[in-house]
Structure formats: C-alpha cells, structure tokens
Amino acid sequence: MHTPKCRRPSMSATLSHKDLAGLAGCSALAFVLYLNTLNAGFVYDDRRAILANGDVTGARPLANLLRNDFWGTPLVDSGSHGSWRPLCVLSFRLNYLAGGMTPLGYHLVNVMLHCVATWLVFLVARTLLPSRMGVLAAGALFAVHPAHTEAVAGLVGRADLASCVCYLLAYLSYRRHMLNREWGSLILTIMLALAALLCKETAITALLLCGLCDVLSPVGRENSDKVCDGSISGLASFNFQRRFRSLSILGFTLLCGLYCRLSLLPRPSTAFSAADNPTAHESCFWTRTLTFLYLPVANFGILLWPQELSFDWGMEAVSRIRTLWDARNILTAGFYGSLVAILWKGSGLRSAASPMDFAEVANISLPLLRRLGGNSCHTWLGLTCDCHHQLSAPSYRSASAIYSTSSKSKSASWTAAPILGTAFLVLPFLPASNLLFYVGFVMAERVLYLPSVGYCLLFGLGFGHLWQRVNSSWRSRLMLLCGLALLLGVHGVRTFRRNLDWRDEEQLFRSAISINPPKALGNLGSVLSAQGRYEEAELTLRMTLGHRPTMADAHFNLGVVHQKQLNFSSAIPCFRRAIELRPQLAVAYLNLGTSLISLGDHRQEAISVLRTGARLEGSGVRDRGAHVEARYTCYLQLSVLYRSDGRLQDAAAALRESLKALPLLPQKQRAVLHLRLGEILAELQDWNEAEHQQRLAMQLQPEQGAAYVTYGQTLARNGSRLAEAESWFKRALQLAPLEPSSHHHYADFLEQQERHHEALGLRLRAAALAPQDYTLQSCVADALRLLNRLAEAELWYRKAVTLQPMAAHAHANLGAILQMRGLRKEAVACYHKALELQPGHAISRANLARMNVHKHENE
C-alpha cells in the first residue's frame, strides 16, 4: 500500500498566475511612476553626500568608508553627523566608477531599489494577509505613496531604500527558517540584517521584528514531518528548544551589532543646533514631552494624507506644544490609543488560538489518519474531536500561498497581521522618533520609507477584511475597487508632481516656502544668487531675515549677493553679522577679507581677518570639507597679500603653517600649497628648498602639468640646468597637450634663450587653445614683433584690443606697433585712447613725447 509523503511547507511555494500578475503590476507601477526622476540632477543634500564627498569620488582610500560618516566626515570629528552607512556610500562610489558625476545612473539605481522594495512588500503581505486583494492593495499603495518621493527622488534616500530591501529580505528569510529551523536561512537572516545596519542604523530593528514574528508563530507546523513518520508525540507539541535557540541567536546578534556600533566605532560628540531640532533645546520638560509624543502622530499624518511635503521640517515647521489645552494633544491620545487597541485585539486573537491551533492539528493529524486507515482516509473527514473542533482535509501547499476563506484560516492570519503590521510601522521608526534619544532633525520624510511598509500592511489587512465581508455583493466590491482606484490615482498624481519638485533645487525650495519659510527662502536665495539673479536673491534673503533675523547663513548669502555686484561696502556688514552669529563660519572670514581687499585701503584689517579665518579649528561645524576648503583659501589669500607687499618670508610662513594645520586637505590642494611655497622660495633664492617643495607637488599630483612647468621655471634660473629645465617643460606638454599655459610658459623659456621661431609656434598654439584669452593673444603679437613681422603683429594687437577694449595697455601696445610701422596718426589716436582710459599711463605719455605730440593734439 502506497502512503503519500507529507510535504513540508516552504516559503518558495510556486506563485499563482494571479499572484505573479499582481507582483509584476505593483513593481511596474512603481517604475513607471518614478520615470520622471531619471532626468533630475543633484539637489540639496546630494551635493554634500556625493559631489563633495571624497569617499565617493575615490579621493580617499576605500578603508575610509569604515572610518567616516555618510557625509565623508571622520566619525571622530566633533562635527560628524554620526550616521555610519558604509554600504550606501560604497554604492555611490560604484556609481561614480561606472558613470562619473552623471546623475542618471544614480537615479536609476534608486528607482530600481524602489521597485525591488515594492516587490518584497508584496511578498511580505502575502505571508501575513488572508486576502489576495488585501495583498494587492498593500503592494500598490507602497508603490505609489507620495511620502516615498524624498527617498526615491533624493539620492541620499538610497540609505533608506537599500536598508528597506535588506530589512524585508531578512524578514522573509527568517520566515523560511521558522518552517524547519534550517541553519542556512538563519545565517542568511543575520547577514541581511547586518547589511541593513550597514545601509542605515535604524534597520538593526529587523532582528527584533524577526524575533517577534517567531514568538507570534502558530504551534505545530515545523514538526509535521515527525507526525508523518508516525510519531504521535509531535501532534501538538512545538520544539521550544529550537525556537529558543533561534531567538537566542537573534538576541546575541542584536547585542553584538549594537555593541560594535556604539562601542567599537567612534562616537562623535555631535551637538545638533537649535535650528535642526528646536524641541530638543527646549528648557521646559512638559513642552519637550508633549511635542515629542506628538511627532509620531505628525509623521503618521503624512502617511495618511501626504499633501504637505517638505525637504526640511526643522526650525519652526512643527510648532511646539506648550500647553495641555493644545488640540493636538487629542490627536496624540487617539493615536496611541489606536495602537494599544490594535495590539490588544491581536493579543486577544492570539489567546483565542492558544494553546493549540486546531487547524494546524488537523493538517498534521490527517496524514497520520491516512496511514492508519489506508485509502479510506475520506471516512475520517467531518469527524469532530472531543474538543468539538471539526477535522478537515489537509492542504499540502505552503500557508504563504493560500488565501483561505475558512474561519480558522482567517483567524490565524488576523492573529499575526495586526501585530506584525504595527511592528513594521513602529520598530524602524523608534530610533528616529526622539523618544529614545535626541536626533538631529524634527521630521524627515525619507525616514518614513521603511515604517510605511507597516502602514501599507495594515491598510491591506483592512481592505482585505472589507473585501471578504462583502463577497456576496458585487456592487459593494465594485465600490471598494473604485475607492481603491481613486486613492491610488490621487496618490499617484501627487507622487508624479512631487517628483518634479525634486528635479532642481529652485523648484524644491519654492515648494516648501509655506511649510518652512526661513529654511526654504534662505536656500532659494543662495540658488538665485548662483544663477546671477541678484535682485531676486536679495529680496528672497531679506524675506528670510524677516522670518529669522538670527540666521547666519542668510546674512552670509546676502553678503555674497552684494559682493558679486561689487557692492563691497554693503557686503562687509553682512559678513560681520554672519561671523557674530556663527564664529566658526570660516567662509565668512574669507569673504570678509576679500571684500576688505577690494575696498583698497583695508589691507591690514584684511590680513587680520584672513589669519583668524585660516586658524579656525571649526569645533562642531557640520560640513568639515567646506570648512577645510575655506581655511585653505584663507591661507592662499594671505600668502598672496604678503607676496604683493613684498613680505616673502611671511608668505612662506603662512603656506608652511597651512600644510601643518590642514592634514585632511585633499592631495590636489596640498600640491597647490607646495607649488606656491616653491615659487616663493625661488624668489627668495632658496633654490634647494624650492626644488624640494616642487618635487613634493609633483609627487602628490603627478598628472598635473602645472607642477612640471613651475619646476622647469625654477631650474631655468640656474644657467647650468637649462637642458634639464626644458625636459620638464616638454613633460608638461606631453601630460597636458591641450593646456594653454603649458605652451605659454614653454614659449617664455624659449624666448629667454632667444629661440624666437620655436617660441612663436608655441604662442600660436596657446592662442588657438584659448582664443578669448587677452594675454595669450598679446603674446603672439609680441612674438611676431620680435621677429619683425610687424603687419602680422598689428593684426594680433587689434584682436587683443577687441578682447579688452577698456584696458589702456591694450591700446598703448597697438599704438606702439602702428608707430613702428609709420602710421603716425593712428598711433597717436591709440595713445590718446589709452590716456582717456588711464590718464596717468606712462608708456603712452612717453611715446607721445617722443613723437612731439601734446596730449590734446589732434592731427
């Protein structure tokens, strides 16, 4: 007699055609809806996290991914954000290697990750929800929800996308492990959870979710193979030892992960500003408590009705709750009451199914009855046991593939789904809620990406329940479908339009003016200034200061607007106010110093300001890279000032100080400092040290021709090393054949050797490479004059005049060549034009005197 073998339930059960269609439809919907993000650029935080991040561009070693935060700042730095996401930064680095700084590749990866996440949400819903329509509703809602726009359209949201994918995969892997306690699935779960942690720290809660899922799992399923082999003791028993082992491993892994993150890795002493999280700086305990209790409600409100969305919810975007009579406290009470009700209902259903799940007992016992009764197993169907639970025919399909309409199947699904749906909503959000510890923001839409999985599961659970309750009325089901279609349509349109806001910074900042005016207007003013729209920028920045007079960035940006319009007297007070409000703002010192220089009579004050800015340590500054860049430029400006005043020793000292004070400076900028120091030392005739500094510059930037040119110029000052100097000029040309300055400086060297014909060829090549460069065009004319090719020289001098018609020396040079050619009248006109532009122009006066022409003579 043949006895059928019992099949073990598996998460890899074959999907039905309807499931495959729903899965493909949800993923396709997610892809199509975000297609309009593929032509977007780098906006807002993308610039700092990608464009200015040396960990992404390869400017730093790969090992630095483990030592630096998400923004490229060392974790030990006082200004570090503390966000450690090496896998996400690694993905950006791979994007850079594949396509450089072309944004299309970055956006495509984000869209594909969202499609994968939608796919996985569908599969997760399929393990929890009793109705296929509920699963479809959950997957479709996740695909179109507008709250996901920041995570998908904003490139820094990749941390949330990738962590969500790993989080859901870890959950699905552990569901498989729960069926038969295989070690492979458990190890895979742990690896996926740790990968999620390496994408974003909040995803470590995946291990908590897996443990909760195990605790809520029904009894009896994993031992069905023993029953099939005739072990009656496995009928209702559950192997608590194996479950305890799995839970212990999860707990140990969670503790190890937390220990490694909090103890082994550096923890920055970051002090978030009041603008980032004003409630955290509130002195009143009750205001802090009531506001932080309300923030999860506000976040849930975005999930419920995502009409008002903003790139930033800091400052006063969410006003603090200062009294018990604030109406928002009612919403807070209702929200937490609803959570308790869901958990209470779930625990009640759980109790009703304990200690024995009779549907599971039936599925386990009927194969045993078949062995006892042979082929007459059907005679056992419909029997009722002593506990009055009727036995039914067994199903050998995976529970994850069944959408049963029986009351027991519904009860089993309803037992876990509300609790696990709530867990998906709450657990990943807790670390960012400000309830456990303060974080550097009030609200952030991309933080909701993973918690929204729980929201979509609960929505799908409710929709599926309604769908099953009206199964006898096609009109009611049609109304449900219309309602679902309307909701998805409204969300889809909102998502599509919100994607357009994320295409460029101007539109993004304009979209948030009504929610966070000072932040949005301040950033918008900076964008308008960069576009050269100075009047709009000034108006916008003054509106910003009307909302928040103590905003240092707004004062600084307003100063930049005045500076770009050459209105230095108005720019200086703005920079001074920015420094007063934020003393560590090095770039404000830099701009203040350059503005003072431009006024002409404040050189000593400018030197003092630049020296102060260059020596700022920048304790607690958020953007360490920008701070170091500003200090570096302050040192360079300081050396230029000293050099122009003839204080070469002071200039060299400033550059030496910069090399010691800025150890984190990128190699390219360190090379510039060595190069400048070498030039100054050469002027001081310290040849050996000058040569040493220039060799250091070449070692740091071997692909930069400028270092070779400067080294060649230094060697050329030594008459015994002319051949060696020329070899370095030739190397520079080989390295950068399209660099005009390489040809220009080599030509200078050849002219010093009176090799004028060779020099002319290089002059012509340099001028062809930079046809709008006045100096290079003038040098061609000079080279032709030295070869006595005066007619050709005249043409080049005339071209130079067209490039700089307001430059007195350009007209004087043209006058000189005309004078040499005997064109006296035209030459005098050129000299007069030069004197008109610069009344004290010495060369024009001298040449007119040689021609016996008075200044106002008109021949």
From Swiss-Prot:
Residues 1-22, 125-134, 175-189, 267-288, 350-422, 468-473 are cytoplasmic. One of its GO terms (cellular component) is endoplasmic reticulum membrane. The chain crosses the membrane at residues 23-43, 104-124, 135-154, 155-174, 190-210, 246-266, 289-309, 329-349, 423-443, 447-467, 474-493. Keywords: Endoplasmic reticulum, Glycoprotein, Membrane, Repeat, TPR repeat, Transferase, Transmembrane, Transmembrane helix. Residues 44-103, 211-245, 310-328, 444-446, 494-859 are extracellular. Glycans are attached at residues 567, 718. One of its GO terms (molecular function) is dolichyl-phosphate-mannose-protein mannosyltransferase activity. It is a multi-pass membrane protein. It comes from the Eukaryota. It holds the Pfam family TPR_7. InterPro entries: TMTC_DUF1736, TMTC_O-mannosyltransferase, TPR-like_helical_dom_sf, TPR_2, TPR_rpt. TPR repeats lie at residues 518-551, 552-585, 586-620, 632-665, 671-704, 705-739, 740-773, 774-807, 808-841. Disulfide bonds: none annotated. The keyword Coiled coil does not apply. This is Protein O-mannosyl-transferase Tmtc1. It comes from Drosophila melanogaster. The lineage of its organism: Eukaryota, Metazoa, Ecdysozoa, Arthropoda, Hexapoda.
